[in-house]
Regions:
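Feature captures the catalytic ectodomains and active-site-proximal regions of enzymes
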Residues: 1-403
Length: 403
């Protein structure tokens, strides 16, 4: 997206309000060739009603056929080119827990995991240990690990996830992940991807060596993996690009982090999906763009729990009337990527998308699902970068281009 093209077209006196409701990992697959996806299986009368008044399609955020990570996928939804604006998961996780990243910091996202006697990963999430156990393990590592010449920060994120930060001179984030992102494999050795990152890579290798020795008798979290090494980027801000006063409502730190890195106001984490809508209602008069994030669709997909994912979609559907009661000008319902429970992982499949607005040209499709979206006017593989200009146009916030 050409930000310089958009900026002069923004209407200064525009009032239209936009809600971007993201069900993480929404896209799915049928378990059998003649079956339905999770979204198609779910009973969603409220979303189906909106679909009959909306424009539908399937989007992708990164080059077609490539599986996106969560951070890059969300950047696409926010109108940033995910390939140009690449960011490590560590920065997003650090910002998501309100860690104040400095100019000499490099962050990574950590997972406590379970390995066998040969160092082969048997559970990438260590049984989804509770956050309190993650805090204990972080404290244990901080207390015993010694890395001369740098400051080490370890903070729990949520459940098995933690944030790793090194602070010091001459650190560079171009270090390869130790996380193979699969069971049945050993952790990778951290390698510098550029010569200037060799110091950082050596520190990571030493951290891993000491940390594994400390955790070897713990159970189930007897090891850890790291990914997404990066420092804080300097990017154009979301509100400046789109002429909006945005706010993010998200429970999980990583998604709060991606909102922070683009300059959104981020509200305190809610305890449930219903409380997220409570926040939407509370702050409705203070903002004009609302990013509302639902995590559990992705979590159940990664766990291979088809019925659990269906249930969460149905819970979200039950909240739709509360959103519509606020009288938004535009409501976009979509996901950041697909996480089919059949695959237990992110996938390359396109993501169902609905743009409901007071100015929509309805497609006349009376359901919201992957195959219904195939018939929609937005197309079967439109670019996620197009969502923000479409949202602003539907909200009557953009002037015409050209004479």
């Amino acid at each position: 997206m050409d930000f310089d093209l958009i900026k002069p077209l923004l209407k200064e006196d525009a009032k239209g309000k936009i809600v971007l409701l993201v069900m993480d990992g929404l896209g799915g697959l049928p378990l059998t060739p003649d079956g339905k996806t999770e979204l198609e299986t779910a009973k969603t009368p409220n979303m189906d009603k909106l679909a009959s008044q909306a424009e539908l399609g399937l989007h992708h955020s990164v080059p077609f056929g490539i599986t996106p990570g969560s951070g890059q996928a969300h950047l696409g939804l926010f109108g940033y080119d995910p390939v140009e604006y690449e960011i490590g998961r560590g920065v997003l996780s650090a910002l998501g827990i309100d860690f104040d990243l400095g100019p000499n910091d490099v962050a990574a996202r950590g997972n406590f995991c379970t390995v066998d006697e040969n160092g082969v990963i048997t559970d990438r999430r260590a049984g989804r240990i509770p956050t309190e156990e993650g805090q204990r393990l972080c404290n244990l590592l901080k207390e015993k690990i010694n890395l001369p010449g740098v400051e080490l920060f370890l903070e729990p994120e949520k459940e098995y996830r933690f944030v790793f930060v090194l602070r010091g001179e001459g650190l560079d984030g171009h270090v390869g992940d130790t996380d193979p992102q699969a069971v049945g494999k050993k952790a990778h050795i951290a390698e510098a991807q550029k010569p200037e990152a060799e110091k950082m890579a050596e520190l990571v290798r030493e951290f891993v060596r000491q940390g594994n020795e400390i955790l070897k008798n713990e159970h189930p979290a007897n090891s850890f993996v790291l990914r997404g090494f990066a420092g804080m980027p300097k990017w154009p801000k979301f509100n400046d690009i789109w002429g909006l006063n945005s706010v993010a409502i998200a429970m999980y730190p990583m998604y709060r982090g991606v909102a922070k890195v683009v300059g959104m106001t981020v509200l305190p984490p809610a305890e449930s999906m219903s409380k997220e809508i409570d926040m939407l209602e509370k702050y409705w008069n203070e903002h004009d763009f609302f990013f509302v994030h639902i995590k559990k669709t992705d979590s159940y997909g990664e766990d291979g729990n088809f019925d659990g994912k269906v249930g969460i979609i149905e819970e979200v559907d039950a909240l739709i009337p509360r959103i519509m009661a606020l009288d938004p000008d535009v409501l976009i319902i979509t996901g950041d990527h697909s996480t089919p429970s059949k695959l237990k992982a992110h996938s390359w499949h396109t993501i169902p998308t609905m743009i409901w607005s007071k100015n929509a040209r309805p497609d006349g499709i009376n359901e919201f699902g992957e195959r219904a979206c195939l018939r929609g006017s937005l197309g079967s593989r439109f670019d996620a970068n197009d969502l923000m200009p479409l949202a602003l146009s539907h909200a009557l916030r953009i002037e015409k281009f050209g004479a």
